């Protein structure tokens, strides 16, 4: 049942990307995209190069060691960078202005309440 659901999710992600609908994957979700071939020809990141290589995917030349990678409508991140991942999603979707997004990120990154007013 789990593998079937993963395949369905990957197929939906492929449809979204083909229709220019953003897709975001963090931690193990990047492995699901890799298994489906969705990371074979696009810049991406994951938990580590060795982690994602276990999927047998062909995208190693496109792997980047980075807190997040945004390639068109595809956003990927390792498990350790959930804050940066959220910031990239908000940026992609245009949820906040650049100024408000910077304040939001700084508040959660530092815990300094002065950024709340920004």
Question: Where are the regions that the model predicts?
Answer:
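Active-site-adjacent pocket-lining segments in enzyme domains
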Residues: 1-118
